[in-house]
Protein backbone atom coordinates (compact mmCIF):
# COMPACT_ATOMS: atom_id res chain seq x y z
CA UNK A 1 0.00 0.00 0.00
CA UNK A 2 1.29 3.45 -0.79
CA UNK A 3 1.42 6.30 -3.25
CA UNK A 4 3.97 7.06 -5.96
CA UNK A 5 5.18 10.63 -5.60
CA UNK A 6 8.14 12.75 -6.67
CA UNK A 7 9.67 11.92 -3.28
CA UNK A 8 9.90 8.18 -3.98
CA UNK A 9 10.61 8.15 -7.72
CA UNK A 10 13.88 8.75 -9.48
CA UNK A 11 14.93 11.92 -11.22
CA UNK A 12 15.02 12.12 -15.01
CA UNK A 13 18.52 12.78 -16.28
CA UNK A 14 20.43 13.12 -19.50
CA UNK A 15 22.66 10.17 -20.21
CA UNK A 16 24.09 7.91 -22.82
CA UNK A 17 25.21 4.32 -22.86
CA UNK A 18 25.43 1.49 -25.34
CA UNK A 19 25.81 -2.25 -25.34
CA UNK A 20 27.04 -4.03 -28.43
CA UNK A 21 25.43 -7.35 -29.33
CA UNK A 22 27.48 -9.70 -31.48
CA UNK A 23 27.46 -13.34 -32.49
CA UNK A 24 30.07 -15.71 -31.16
CA UNK A 25 31.32 -16.24 -34.71
CA UNK A 26 31.77 -12.50 -35.31
CA UNK A 27 33.72 -12.14 -32.06
CA UNK A 28 35.98 -15.11 -32.77
CA UNK A 29 36.71 -13.90 -36.33
CA UNK A 30 37.96 -10.63 -34.84
CA UNK A 31 39.75 -12.18 -31.87
CA UNK A 32 37.50 -10.34 -29.41
CA UNK A 33 36.32 -11.47 -25.97
CA UNK A 34 32.76 -10.67 -24.88
CA UNK A 35 31.94 -9.29 -21.45
CA UNK A 36 28.88 -11.51 -21.10
CA UNK A 37 26.73 -14.05 -22.88
CA UNK A 38 22.94 -13.71 -23.10
CA UNK A 39 21.31 -16.91 -21.87
CA UNK A 40 17.66 -15.93 -21.96
CA UNK A 41 15.07 -13.17 -22.21
CA UNK A 42 11.49 -12.66 -21.14
CA UNK A 43 8.81 -10.04 -21.59
CA UNK A 44 5.50 -10.00 -19.75
CA UNK A 45 2.40 -7.87 -19.55
CA UNK A 46 1.20 -7.14 -16.03
CA UNK A 47 -1.39 -4.94 -14.36
CA UNK A 48 -0.87 -1.48 -15.88
CA UNK A 49 -2.08 0.06 -12.62
CA UNK A 50 1.10 -1.19 -10.91
CA UNK A 51 3.77 -1.11 -13.65
CA UNK A 52 6.73 -1.04 -11.24
CA UNK A 53 6.07 -4.66 -10.25
CA UNK A 54 6.30 -6.00 -13.81
CA UNK A 55 10.12 -6.31 -13.80
CA UNK A 56 10.11 -8.93 -11.06
CA UNK A 57 7.29 -10.81 -12.79
CA UNK A 58 9.43 -10.95 -15.95
CA UNK A 59 12.36 -12.29 -13.92
CA UNK A 60 10.16 -14.96 -12.31
CA UNK A 61 8.97 -16.08 -15.76
CA UNK A 62 12.52 -16.16 -17.13
CA UNK A 63 13.87 -18.16 -14.20
CA UNK A 64 10.99 -20.62 -14.40
CA UNK A 65 11.61 -21.13 -18.12
CA UNK A 66 15.33 -21.73 -17.48
CA UNK A 67 14.78 -24.02 -14.48
CA UNK A 68 16.56 -21.60 -12.15
CA UNK A 69 15.82 -20.04 -8.77
CA UNK A 70 16.58 -16.55 -7.49
CA UNK A 71 19.28 -18.12 -5.30
CA UNK A 72 21.07 -19.37 -8.46
CA UNK A 73 21.90 -15.78 -9.44
CA UNK A 74 24.83 -13.74 -8.19
CA UNK A 75 23.41 -10.30 -8.99
CA UNK A 76 20.18 -8.53 -9.93
CA UNK A 77 20.04 -5.14 -11.61
CA UNK A 78 16.52 -3.71 -11.67
CA UNK A 79 15.74 -0.29 -13.06
CA UNK A 80 14.18 1.10 -9.91
CA UNK A 81 12.37 4.10 -11.31
CA UNK A 82 10.15 3.81 -8.23
CA UNK A 83 11.18 2.97 -4.65
CA UNK A 84 8.50 0.27 -4.53
CA UNK A 85 10.59 -1.89 -6.91
CA UNK A 86 13.41 -2.32 -4.39
CA UNK A 87 11.06 -2.51 -1.43
CA UNK A 88 8.96 -5.25 -3.02
CA UNK A 89 12.04 -7.23 -4.12
CA UNK A 90 13.54 -7.11 -0.62
CA UNK A 91 10.21 -8.19 0.88
CA UNK A 92 9.66 -11.11 -1.52
CA UNK A 93 13.26 -12.31 -1.84
CA UNK A 94 14.83 -11.76 1.58
CA UNK A 95 17.47 -14.46 1.07
CA UNK A 96 18.95 -12.66 -1.97
CA UNK A 97 18.03 -9.05 -1.16
CA UNK A 98 21.72 -8.13 -0.79
CA UNK A 99 22.27 -9.03 -4.47
CA UNK A 100 19.94 -6.30 -5.80
CA UNK A 101 21.39 -3.09 -7.28
CA UNK A 102 24.68 -3.33 -5.40
CA UNK A 103 25.91 -0.02 -6.78
CA UNK A 104 22.62 1.75 -6.21
CA UNK A 105 19.81 2.15 -8.68
CA UNK A 106 17.97 4.86 -10.54
CA UNK A 107 16.94 6.43 -7.24
CA UNK A 108 20.64 7.03 -6.58
CA UNK A 109 21.98 7.90 -10.02
CA UNK A 110 18.91 9.00 -11.99
CA UNK A 111 16.91 7.66 -14.90
CA UNK A 112 18.37 8.66 -18.27
CA UNK A 113 15.66 8.03 -20.86
CA UNK A 114 16.96 5.91 -23.69
CA UNK A 115 19.98 4.74 -21.72
CA UNK A 116 18.48 2.94 -18.71
CA UNK A 117 18.54 -0.55 -20.23
CA UNK A 118 22.15 -0.28 -21.36
CA UNK A 119 23.13 1.31 -18.06
CA UNK A 120 21.77 -1.49 -15.89
CA UNK A 121 23.23 -4.12 -18.23
CA UNK A 122 26.68 -2.52 -17.98
CA UNK A 123 26.37 -2.35 -14.18
CA UNK A 124 25.40 -6.02 -14.09
CA UNK A 125 28.30 -7.08 -16.32
CA UNK A 126 30.81 -5.12 -14.24
CA UNK A 127 29.44 -6.40 -10.93
CA UNK A 128 29.72 -10.00 -12.13
CA UNK A 129 33.24 -9.35 -13.41
CA UNK A 130 34.56 -7.59 -10.29
CA UNK A 131 32.90 -9.91 -7.80
CA UNK A 132 33.67 -13.04 -9.83
CA UNK A 133 29.99 -13.84 -10.18
CA UNK A 134 28.76 -16.21 -12.86
CA UNK A 135 25.14 -15.33 -13.58
CA UNK A 136 22.82 -12.35 -13.22
CA UNK A 137 19.62 -10.71 -14.41
CA UNK A 138 18.88 -7.20 -15.64
CA UNK A 139 15.21 -6.22 -15.51
CA UNK A 140 13.19 -3.16 -16.33
CA UNK A 141 9.53 -2.21 -15.90
CA UNK A 142 8.03 -0.25 -18.76
CA UNK A 143 4.92 1.80 -19.34
CA UNK A 144 1.60 0.01 -19.48
CA UNK A 145 2.66 -2.82 -17.20
CA UNK A 146 5.30 -4.33 -19.50
CA UNK A 147 8.23 -6.05 -17.78
CA UNK A 148 11.43 -7.24 -19.43
CA UNK A 149 14.30 -9.36 -18.12
CA UNK A 150 17.60 -10.59 -19.56
CA UNK A 151 19.68 -13.43 -18.08
CA UNK A 152 23.44 -13.24 -18.68
CA UNK A 153 26.49 -15.27 -17.82
CA UNK A 154 29.81 -13.63 -17.14
CA UNK A 155 32.48 -14.64 -19.66
CA UNK A 156 35.87 -15.53 -18.24
CA UNK A 157 38.51 -14.20 -20.65
CA UNK A 158 40.92 -17.05 -19.91
CA UNK A 159 38.28 -19.73 -20.57
CA UNK A 160 37.15 -17.96 -23.75
CA UNK A 161 40.75 -17.80 -25.04
CA UNK A 162 41.46 -21.44 -24.16
CA UNK A 163 38.31 -22.56 -25.97
CA UNK A 164 39.27 -20.50 -29.01
CA UNK A 165 42.72 -22.13 -29.06
CA UNK A 166 41.18 -25.63 -28.85
CA UNK A 167 39.12 -24.90 -31.97
CA UNK A 168 41.94 -23.50 -34.11
Language model segments and positions:
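Claisen-condensing/thiolase-fold acyl-transfer catalytic domains that form or cleave C-C bonds
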Residues: 1-168
